[in-house]
Amino acid sequence: DLGTTHAVVSWAPCEAGAEAQVFPIPQLVSLGETEERPLLPSFLYAPLPGEPPSDPFGDAPWAIGEVARRRGREVPGRVVSSAKSWLCHAAVDRTAAILPWGAADGDADLPRVSPVEACSRVLSHLRRAWDEAHPGHPLREQEVVLTVPASFDQTARLLTVQAARDAGLSARLLEEPQAAFYDAMAHLGLERFEKLLAD
């Protein structure tokens, strides 16, 4: 789930009856301290000159995850948040480096990123974390499904697919309400269901 505020990786072996598991995502939680957490905040932070390296996967010039969320509260002009929401904002060029939104134009050491690239960087962090934990089963070789809001129009969906492709993933999209329905079915033990249509 490439969420607006958090991303999560849930996975299951392809065998019948296999239980889904949440993948613990390594990330910086403070400058210089890495932890595995079930959620990766969908935040990017551009470290100030002289701050330690950005994250366990060398996402320079951006720090991604919990440290980005925390530092973003302290230095708000250097953080990108809610990048996924920008994918459906038709009034801006979603492929242009417009984020962090509202940051001072004259800040020469502040990198800029497009909404598509910001989403791709979050997905890339997830891919590299998975690949490091599962070197014999890289994520690019797995069947990847990304959930998207039902409100995403065709352009936002295509941009999500582009972000995944830019992160080295081939992904199928699934609307979030449909994903929730499938999850509820699995928890109820319903392997098969029939639809009743009524007027």
Predicted regions and their residues:
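Flexible, glycine-rich phosphate/dinucleotide-binding loops
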Residues: 16, 153, 180
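Phosphate-binding loop and its immediate beta->loop->alpha context
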Residues: 19-167, 174
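Charged, compositionally biased non-catalytic regions
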Residues: 5-8, 163, 177
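Short acidic, glycine/serine/threonine-rich loops at helix termini
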Residues: 10-12, 156-160, 183-187
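Short, flexible loop/turn elements at secondary-structure junctions
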Residues: 4, 150-152, 178
